[in-house]
């Protein structure tokens, strides 16, 4: 109620704009009886000509996802990689991730972050990442915005934030001496 939303310089009501956005949620919402290959076939029907089946297959291979294994047999990290492959296969300009690395083991989290870093190397791509894991933000963010109860408290360049603020770990006695 306090403003407007623009995505890629247009309103989110524009179907052409929505087609340029990939979304990854904390949990993958695919039928567990499906296989990654079946997910790709379903999404091809949704995205139409924008869907790149060859790229999706390449992503499955890159992410070491077995195309014929049912989703219920995949680990949480593998499900997240399937979710990411599904979001990337129509080659979006903007990738929106909501707690995409939450609950993953360190190895899976690192692999997801590497994939995101590869994605943003192309300056035509952007990532909007919602996360409570500050180390993830340190690794891939250029700008960090802090929202609290729906209010934007700040949006600053990550390097400026790192220079301006820090964490002091000490006892109360040491703090009192400062």
Model-derived segments and their meaning:
Residues 151-177:
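Conserved beta-strand-loop-alpha-helix hinge in the C-terminal portion
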Residues 1-128, 132-135, 139-148, 154:
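ABC transporter nucleotide-binding domains
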């Amino acid at each position: 109620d306090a403003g407007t939303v623009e995505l890629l310089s247009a309103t989110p009501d524009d179907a052409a704009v929505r087609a340029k956005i990939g979304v990854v949620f904390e949990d993958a919402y695919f039928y567990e009886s499906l296989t990654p290959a079946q997910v790709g076939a379903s999404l091809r029907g949704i995205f139409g000509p924008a869907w790149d089946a060859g790229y999706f297959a390449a992503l499955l291979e890159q992410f070491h996802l077995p195309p014929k294994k049912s989703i219920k047999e995949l680990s949480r990290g593998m499900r997240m990689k399937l979710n990411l492959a599904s979001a990337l296969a129509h080659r979006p300009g903007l990738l929106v991730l909501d707690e995409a690395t939450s609950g993953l083991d360190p190895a899976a989290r690192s692999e997801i972050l590497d994939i995101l870093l590869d994605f943003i190397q192309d300056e035509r791509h952007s990532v909007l990442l919602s996360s409570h894991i500050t180390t993830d933000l340190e690794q891939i963010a250029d700008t960090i915005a802090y929202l609290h109860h729906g209010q934007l408290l700040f949006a600053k360049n990550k390097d400026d934030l790192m220079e301006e603020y820090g964490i002091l770990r000490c006892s109360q006695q040491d703090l009192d001496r400062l």
